[in-house]
């Protein structure tokens, strides 16, 4: 009966956003090359805006009679801005706009930096009413320095206009942790058809913040951070952790990151963690294929870890073992642009060749053998890769963020990884394959799928093999009066092939059944379905927007030689709320409640989480560092 109730609720969650709820109001601009740019047009604010203003005016009039109530009201209420919350309809795509100036020489670059709390990026001529708290925020915030903005430009004065490069540059600005949005405009020079000026307009986030994570009533963490230290784009974070179940019960972590070293677009950082019998230090540097014409990418990292862990002995008894190990990781890749007849992916198609070396060394560890506790073997892995990639971006909003511009990748990645593992017990060749694709369907929404398979070859057979499949759909926006609805559906499948005896997979809280954490359910094969229906409301409080959601997850897990559907079904359903002010770097405040109709003995049927949540990220189709696929 419980499973039947769960099925009914899941069906409702899956079907509700797909049915015709209200009027679907979308503007889709099509160009001659059939490229589609998705624009969500918000027409539901007008009536509510009038009623909201009347309510606020009445409330403010009453509160103004008392100094204390007036000050308190200024802290929590502002008038909802007329523009800037949603992407407006454009007459032409930005790419077509930049095409008008292709090949012209850049005479001068001018930078304009808007206030954190102020006019929206796409209508900077307006002068909105600001509360005293917002004015204080603008005065205490250090805007990103001009030098840092110029360091993040892909072009310089004297260069010629490259439309694709300008599009990439806007996206790169939006990917920075301290920039809310950015736009690039081109201005003609009167009397000179060959010269233009470029205007770069940016809007910062308020870069200092903190968040509180409550895992349960006996454990949690507090983090403070500055994402744009002194306006130079450096990030510094400190975290204090407490868990009364552990001894010692308190710990801390520190992280320092530089986003762009001297205009090389190399990200570097150092992090240190010491808590709950674990100490780790890591130094790393990373450069991605950040633009269509980037030729070189790679990373290098060094880490040292010491930790206590409960590990099985060969006789299957558990023993608390001190692990002390180090890891060195080096990857380098070269990109070659390919010519294509597909206009949609012109200058967006490439072939990438890469190589990677990983060295894992254990100085202290558990009892091991050739086929036991493989994760604690000393090993060296050398991998090479060849990848075909094509990728471009559309802009939309109200997907993972609460109204700001989001870049949606579409494209294809096909990558082959081949290499060799030198283990302390054996030497084995490795082969793996990755295929990923992202598509936008105007009548349905966004579809992404990813397939991974790989394994090592030893003693005339494949061992430690794995097959993974993930499919994700994001629906178009549907309207229910003033509420905007969007649904997210996910399917995850994992199967192990000839894994070692002590290798098992478990349900993962974030990928399978949310909040479902147990050590009693495991296997070599699992399948899960996730559904979330998100309601974007027009409820604001001091620019904090409220988003409500409901979710339903089901999963199966079991042995390799048994159909996954013949295992017991486990499920979870729940509700939650997310709150965020997109002018701040504060993580999204989230309250999430779940109920599980059937649970193993080491779990409770109810779970409540209060936490800070970072934005989820879309799957990109850039070539990746070759790797052995995780099980």
Task: Give the ranges of each region predicted by the language model.
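Amphipathic hydrophobic-ligand
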Residues: 466-467
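Immediate N-terminus of the mature polypeptide
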Residues: 2-4, 20-462, 473-631
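Bacterial N-terminal signal peptides
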Residues: 9-17
